Amino acid sequence: MKRTFLLLLLAICAGNLAAQTANDSLPKLDPKLKATLNATDQAAYQIAMAYSDQAVAKSKLFDLMVRNPDDVRYREALANLYFDSRQYASAALVSLDILQTNGKNIGALEIAAYSLEQLGALDRALPHFESLHLLTGDNFSLYKSAFIQYSLKRYEEAMNSVNMLIKSAKADDKVGFPKSQTETQEIGMKAAALNLKGLIYLDQNSMAEAKTAFNEAISLDPAFDQAKENLKKTN
């Protein structure tokens, strides 16, 4: 996990240096020519996306990025393309590059958080989920923060996040839980938070408290299969 992020960090540093060197050495284009080239590449990008040709779309985005190094839109589009094609390392690199310039870029925070999570770098994904919640008030980002804190055995932080979530969860907030290999069960956020609270207690051998939390989760959503299975572990 640490090695994965170290490689990402080295790649970011090398990429920034290479990009700066390349930008410094590029000749200045006539504004009209630049606008024409931009319009041509943007049109080609749109056509490539319409035909699901991501390779050409990425190529055009790179051309646009080189020509317009200060326009973050092209990096954002590239990060989305990488993420959608499950190239999580590349998605993380681009989004982290964006965040170096603007740490409050919501799209980049989302892609960085989920990409780093997919790469197994949970300790690096966590601050991005936390920032997302602070900036947007999104309860799912808070749930992800709590679950990662629990996974990292940072139980006090996880419990604080869970208690915040129990208070702020809305009726239409849902979390998906796997029911089978092909089926997902949608559970209310408050019930999901109580289930996570039970898991935190369970990890600390606080069986009575865990049992109470699981029972509360089931009372909110009687069809909550995972909470029922977790409840059995308290007997």
Name what the model sees in each region:
Residues 69, 103, 136-137, 170, ...:
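Short coil turns that delineate tetratricopeptide repeat
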Residues 74, 108, 141-142, 174-175, ...:
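TPR alpha-solenoid repeat register
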Residues 77, 111, 144, 189, ...:
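Canonical tetratricopeptide repeat
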Residues 18-73:
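N-terminal leader/linker segments that initiate helical-solenoid repeat arrays
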